[in-house]
Amino acid sequence: MTRYSRITGTGSYLPPHRVTNDDLVAQLAQQGIETSDEWIVERTGIRARHFADRDVTSSDLALEASRRALEAAGCQAQDLDLIIVATSTPDMVFPSTACILQNKLGANGCPAFDVQAVCSGFVYALTVADAMIRSGGARRALVVGSEVFSRILDFNDRTTCVLFGDGAGAVVLEASEAPGILASDLHADGSHVGILCVPGNVYGGQILGDPLLKMDGQAVFKLAVGVLEKAARATLDKAGMTDADIDWLIPHQANIRIMQSTARKLKLSMDKVVVTVDQHGNTSAASIPLALDHGVRNGQVQPGQTVLLEGVGGGFTWGAVLLKM
């Protein structure tokens, strides 16, 4: 019998501290940096984001999102036999945030590890979990994207500090006789490392290089709009489907312009795109599961519908997953 995997529950969590554009404008003005709500909205579509308190970690956010996903799936943490966390802002250098989350959930014993593909991280992690379930290596997996990007932002750079927020999203992925994950397509091109990175490191207890986020926005935009269409079409081809079969597009919530461009290339109305970037900002690996959970809980995404997830991020990494809810 062919074995498949299917999402049986979704969950998400945003830290309570909500920062509007006006809040950020006022903060930056105190540092002599000029920007405006209009400037941010016009270029990004972002109106607000959430920042975690100083003592809150990625695993803390992941814990809340995971509990909600487990509840939605009707299972307990002890039922898990795999945990994968996608994050670029781990609690520690090691052990993995997944191991820390596993302990907080009380799911000790199952394999747990992190995936680091920045904003493509959740798509990568979901693909790995699907492969492990299909091969018989797992039966019920928890796949999480969780980030505290506010820790690595340069608040002297108005072009980047307004873009990102903190949050977590999670799904429970279970073995199924009916196809859930239909196809996926992953890519990376390390020749573009410098256009989106945090170029710092730790050596002998000292920080080497720059520990804050750097981005060439124009280069990222140009590359993203091209590779996202290619990944989408490759994934659809693998599943024997076309643009017309997509009920919902859930892209990485980076920038409304990138999302609009991707939808246009796939001949999709924006009415078929789940958009949360306006309220959450770019939450990196958390953005896709956050948006998916939002779509499920507000009644947009219905059982049986076909959903295309797309991620693109530093590395440069990108990919897509086509699934049936």
Swiss-Prot record:
Keywords linked to the UniProt accession: Acyltransferase, Cytoplasm, Fatty acid biosynthesis, Fatty acid metabolism, Lipid biosynthesis, Lipid metabolism, Multifunctional enzyme, Transferase
Region (ACP-binding): 253-257
EC number in record: 2.3.1.180
CDD domains xref list: KAS_III
A Gene Ontology molecular function term of the record: beta-ketoacyl-acyl-carrier-protein synthase III activity
Reactions catalysed: malonyl-[ACP] + acetyl-CoA + H(+) = 3-oxobutanoyl-[ACP] + CO2 + CoA
Keyword Membrane assigned: no
Active-site residues annotated for this sequence: 119, 252, 282
Cellular component, GO, one term: cytoplasm
Pathway terms, separated by semicolons: Lipid metabolism; fatty acid biosynthesis
Protein family membership: Belongs to the thiolase-like superfamily. FabH family.
Biological role stated in the UniProt entry: Catalyzes the condensation reaction of fatty acid synthesis by the addition to an acyl acceptor of two carbons from malonyl-ACP. Catalyzes the first condensation reaction which initiates fatty acid synthesis and may therefore play a role in governing the total rate of fatty acid production. Possesses both acetoacetyl-ACP synthase and acetyl transacylase activities. Its substrate specificity determines the biosynthesis of branched-chain and/or straight-chain of fatty acids.
PANTHER family: 3-OXOACYL-[ACYL-CARRIER-PROTEIN] SYNTHASE 3 (PTHR34069), BETA-KETOACYL-[ACYL-CARRIER-PROTEIN] SYNTHASE III (PTHR34069:SF2)
Entry note about domains: The last Arg residue of the ACP-binding site is essential for the weak association between ACP/AcpP and FabH.
Subunit structure: Homodimer.
Name assigned to this protein: Beta-ketoacyl-[acyl-carrier-protein] synthase III
